[in-house]
Curated annotation (Swiss-Prot):
Protein name per UniProt: Rhamnulokinase
Gene Ontology biological-process annotations: glycerol metabolic process; rhamnose catabolic process
UniProt record similarity statement: Belongs to the rhamnulokinase family.
Keywords: ATP-binding, Disulfide bond, Kinase, Magnesium, Nucleotide-binding, Rhamnose metabolism, Transferase
Molecular function GO labels: ATP binding; glycerol kinase activity; rhamnulokinase activity
Keyword field contains Kinase: yes
GO cellular component labels: cytosol
EC id: 2.7.1.5
Binding, ATP: 8-12, 254, 299, 397
Binding site for substrate: 78, 231-233, 291
Cofactor(s) this protein requires: Mg(2+)
Reactions the enzyme catalyzes: L-rhamnulose + ATP = L-rhamnulose 1-phosphate + ADP + H(+)
Amino acid sequence: MVAIDLGASSGRVMLASYYPGQQQLTLREVCRFTNQIKSIDGSDVWDIDAIEQSIREGLSQLDSEGIALDSIGIDSWGVDFVLLDKQGKRIGQPVSYRDSRTQGVMARAQQTLGSNAIYRRTGIQFLPFNTLYQLRALSEQQPHLLADVAHLLLIPDYLHYRLTGQLNWEYTNASTTQLLNIETGDWDSDLLAYAGVPAHWFAKPGKPGNTIGYWHSANGQQVPVVAVATHDTASAVLAAPLIDADAAYLSSGTWSLMGFESGTPLTHQQAQCSNITNEGGAEGRYRVLKNIMGLWLLQRATDELQIDDLPQLIEQAARQPACRSLINPNDSRFINPPNMCREIQNACREHQFPVPNTAAQLARCIFDSLAMLYRQVAQELATLRGRPISHLHIVGGGCQNQFLNQLCADACGLNVSMGPVEASTLGNIGSQLISLGEVADVTHYRRIVANNFPLHHLSPHDNSDFAAHWLQFQSLSQLPKELCI
């Protein structure tokens, strides 16, 4: 089986082999490639052709090796999309969610439709780049494009289409758009109308697990292409070895997503005021979670400072005074500033914290601030569920940053387990194995993952200065009142 896992900064083609007798699961990285935002005609866009080419090269390599493939699946980040014309050809490049075209659009939607009405319909966190606001911006700013559009496909659906020629709309990723009605599981006609787009661009989203079509290889293979849980976080959660019903997960990468699984969505006012999202998951579950800006801040800062030795930077950051400077990582100013280091420094200056000037000080500011935000979100989630979190499972690339994860354990006061690193890839494979009938269900698959990919564990440390630091952070991170209206 092949899992193609696309993140906001890189992509990978991974080969998985499963031996049912021993319930052994192995992964092999076929290729890894960078995925970066490009500026074209004043817009920040994804180079979707380069992504597709890298995927095809990985698949062709496996085909040339004579490896018989059972299935293929693709997962990616959410909310971004590709427009197709009536001939099935792409219209322009897909614009990145970090593009500035949506500035002010969400606030106008909240005023016009009411935050309460939008949230009750969708159960989705208010983020300025949700597809709802991207489409409203498109219809306001480039209405001439709309007449040529026949279909809108989210990123993994588009790439599945390119491999098979078949259109598909997968549910877990569709749920991130803030266009899906949480009661019906279908596109909300009133929100589509507000976005300025017709319903015939879409079909009702399907649950993960169906075969979309087939990829025909140069050597004659006809490989089923499976609609996995195509949102990368949905796949990551599918592979998270949650130990009990009170455990929570933190999918840690470019974004950090903290939450828990629920059989029902939480769309009451307390969830809305906490800006909690209810995204679709496997087996009809909901991923009740919150998006946190995550390691994007560090990625941008290290790029600007031209730092390649990340372990050394983390070691230097660990020697800096704790919580000397704090920011709110979820402040919209950090979505895509011209200069991240300068933006962090300005935020510290404005809130009368010492300005971090060295790379180590900047990194420590980011790590401390993320840990504080993890604590805040963990408390919000526990309050919403009505019982404390028993354990936190950190999955994804951020598993490898043990210093940040120890800060998280300390701030949250929770025992933490770390792993698997390739959680999105493994969740992608899990959807394929369940679809193929090789694995019974998600619970069974999580046992397989836990047995094949050992976890690492951390316990919280006491910190006598923590209470004062926590009060300082709380003053930075109050949610806007308009979310509750």
